[in-house]
């Protein structure tokens, strides 16, 4: 059953597996100490959901904020990358211990997983994450996941846990993702402006929806804002998952949001094949090719991408790398795994397939990107 209402996210029958993301500003107070009473109430909610047959995965921020206080670092540990890495090293121990302690009070076992962007961009490592999550959930454990900030560099960082939550949900085969935020959903303009209206349901993250995003995290403790939440919603949408943004500030925030039906629900598309869902959720492209109108129309009909329709090649990518396919207007039409490296694509662009063997010096492949290795956006 496809999720169409906010309350269905907390029902095992409609959402048998749910990812709950908790931000730094909710978990850690301005004094740098964990908000134990608030977190204890949230854990009670998670325990009740688990008892009702719903599997729950937690994506928890807070390690940097917790570690920064212990180390006496300014700016919440975010003054520099090295500060953030050091703070995370200390804070991860405290964060994992806190979750383990509170979950144990309900007879639940916490399992810590630390991930970097590369863990979910590389297909083999992604499948390993999928297998680990499946085993933990089958054993009735509650996975508690965070970005591995102690080793992640700018190049291999998610940068926020909103998108990490969506990618984890995709890897776990979850039906929904619940983002606990410091705001109760997406508004049609800056919610501080008079007349701002919350949007209860979004069907498709369009450019108009993106235009409604405002600013970053207001607390200074986290790294995510509405823009990152919309990017997470796009990942979820492509993977066939529902995603909701709710106000995480009340005690027992999930019950409060569901009882009042207050939040923004992003509706899912239909489920994709696992490989295409992984590809659609990838956040880093190695390059791009631009195509003409004829090729764009052929892609829309479900065809593979042929080199004859390519007009431009950009980036330094290898065969098998993920690249974006841009339309004549520069808009991203698809993502796919290239059958050629960038230099070969540049030689083949605009040329008919009968010319390819002479240009390459070997028997060509059937397409520049095969339709089975491509997802339309």
UniProtKB/Swiss-Prot annotation:
HAMAP family: ProB (MF_00456). The keyword Amino-acid biosynthesis applies. One of its GO terms (molecular function) is glutamate 5-kinase activity. GO terms for cellular component: cytosol. It comes from Novosphingobium aromaticivorans (strain ATCC 700278 / DSM 12444 / CCUG 56034 / CIP 105152 / NBRC 16084 / F199). This is Glutamate 5-kinase. Its EC number is 2.7.2.11. Substrate binds at residues 61, 149, 161. It catalyses: L-glutamate + ATP = L-glutamyl 5-phosphate + ADP. Pathway: Amino-acid biosynthesis; L-proline biosynthesis; L-glutamate 5-semialdehyde from L-glutamate: step 1/2. Keywords: Amino-acid biosynthesis, ATP-binding, Cytoplasm, Kinase, Nucleotide-binding, Proline biosynthesis, Transferase. Belongs to the glutamate 5-kinase family. ATP binds at residues 21, 181-182, 223-229. Catalyzes the transfer of a phosphate group to glutamate to form L-glutamate 5-phosphate. It is found in: Cytoplasm. NCBIfam families: proB (TIGR01027). Residues 286-363 form the PUA domain.
């Amino acid at each position: 059953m496809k999720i169409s209402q906010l309350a269905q996210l907390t029902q095992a029958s409609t959402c048998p597996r749910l990812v709950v993301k908790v931000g730094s500003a909710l978990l850690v107070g301005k004094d740098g100490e964990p908000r134990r009473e608030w977190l204890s109430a949230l854990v009670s909610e998670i325990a009740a959901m688990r008892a009702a047959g719903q599997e729950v995965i937690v994506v928890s921020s807070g390690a940097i904020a917790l570690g920064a206080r212990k180390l006496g670092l300014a700016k919440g540990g975010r003054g520099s990358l090295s500060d953030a890495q050091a703070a995370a090293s200390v804070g991860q121990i405290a964060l994992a211990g806190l979750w383990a302690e509170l979950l144990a009070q309900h007879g639940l076992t916490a399992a810590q997983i630390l991930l970097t962007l590369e863990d979910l961009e590389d297909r083999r490592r992604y499948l390993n994450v999928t297998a680990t999550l499946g085993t933990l959930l089958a054993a009735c454990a509650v996975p508690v996941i965070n970005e591995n900030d102690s080793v992640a560099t700018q190049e291999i960082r998610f940068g926020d846990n909103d998108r990490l939550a969506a990618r984890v949900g995709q890897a776990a085969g979850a039906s929904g993702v619940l983002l606990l935020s410091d705001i109760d959903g997406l508004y049609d303009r800056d919610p501080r402006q008079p007349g701002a209206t919350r949007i209860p349901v979004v069907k498709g993250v369009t450019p108009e929806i993106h235009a409604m995003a405002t600013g970053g995290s207001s607390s200074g403790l986290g790294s995510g804002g509405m823009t990152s939440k919309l990017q997470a919603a796009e990942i979820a949408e492509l993977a066939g998952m529902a995603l909701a943004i709710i106000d995480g500030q009340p005690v027992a925030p999930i019950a409060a949001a569901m009882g009042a039906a207050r939040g923004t629900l992003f509706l899912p598309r239909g489920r994709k094949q696992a490989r295409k869902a992984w590809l659609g959720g990838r956040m880093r492209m190695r390059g791009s090719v631009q195509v003409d109108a004829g090729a764009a129309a052929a892609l829309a009909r479900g065809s593979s991408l042929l080199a004859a329709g390519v007009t431009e090649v950009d980036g330094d990518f290898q065969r098998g790398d993920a690249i974006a396919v841009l339309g004549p207007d520069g808009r991203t039409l698809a993502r796919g795994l290239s059958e050629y490296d960038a230099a070969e694509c540049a030689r083949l662009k605009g040329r008919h397939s009968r010319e390819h063997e002479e240009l390459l010096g070997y028997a060509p492949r059937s397409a520049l990107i095969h339709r089975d290795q491509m997802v339309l956006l």
